[in-house]
Amino acid sequence: GTXXXITIIR
């Protein structure tokens, strides 16, 4: 997902 800046699963 695209929430905030640090994401593992996009």
Swiss-Prot record:
What superkingdom heads the lineage? Eukaryota
Q: What is this protein called?
A: Unknown protein 1
